[in-house]
Amino acid sequence: MTRVIVAVLAAAVWLKGNLHTHTAASDGDSPPAEVAAWYRDRGYDFLVITDHDKITTIDAPQGLVLIAGEEVTDRLPKKPLHVNAIGLTKVVAPQKGTTPVEVLQRNIDAVRAAGGVPLVNHPNFGWAFGADELLQLRNFTLLEIASGHPYVNTQGPPSAESMWDVLLTKGRRVYGVAVDDSHHWKKPLGETDVALPGKAWVVVRAERDAKSIVAALERGDFYASTGVELEEVSATRVKVREKNGAHYRIQFIGDGGRVLQESEGTSASYTMRGNEGYVRVRVIDSNGRMAWGQPERVKR
């Protein structure tokens, strides 16, 4: 068993990818092949195209791993309720329901039944649901905590990141994801009301194939970013890759979103004391860009 684990880790590398992407096959403005090429040409290693209520299939450009995806697009009056399906094997139709919890749970379960990993999208989009509803959901491990889309109100209040902390404080195993939710490649870069690509992503430690990447997401072997790059990361240790003279603030966070330790610099570590509940790391640079490591439960 030890030899197998060592072999897997030896083959794993850091891979950058986007988990929430739209093309002209739904409400994006560019053909799927152009979208995939955009990400490949900018150094992304993998991409999940998540057009609304369909699986968009194209040939992968050389050097880019394409993972099957869909945004299951459900709603109640004035409440958009969306769940991404990552690595699924068949299209999932919106499952409907009478309450946000019922709708989301039915779609989460349907994604699982289709062989996919569910990602609960943008809770603050239309202020559709919050921490109370998330606490009632089961069978999911991924939550959008950062998004490049200008209309999904990620920062709240309350922020999607603070909802994540509520879940973690209650002992839930949930990992935080950053995504583009990209729709627009043909808009001027100066426009602020468009969903442009390249704003947020995840970096996964995995082998360079779809199955390995999806498994790494499911077990939380990744970090999320809106621009900060990390060389090393765990719940209690981080090393930042310096860029463009930026300065970095490193925070270790525990129960209730409380900052346990804070420092300036490009590396830091934290020693668990046993009363934190969980520990996760967040890095903020002097331009406001961020990176989030995944949490570790503290054994009392």
Labelled PLM ranges:
Residues L9-N139, E144-W164, V179-K186, S286, ...:
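A metal-dependent hydrolase metal-coordination microenvironment
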Residues M1-R3, V8-L9, K170-Y175, D180-R300:
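C-terminal functional module detector
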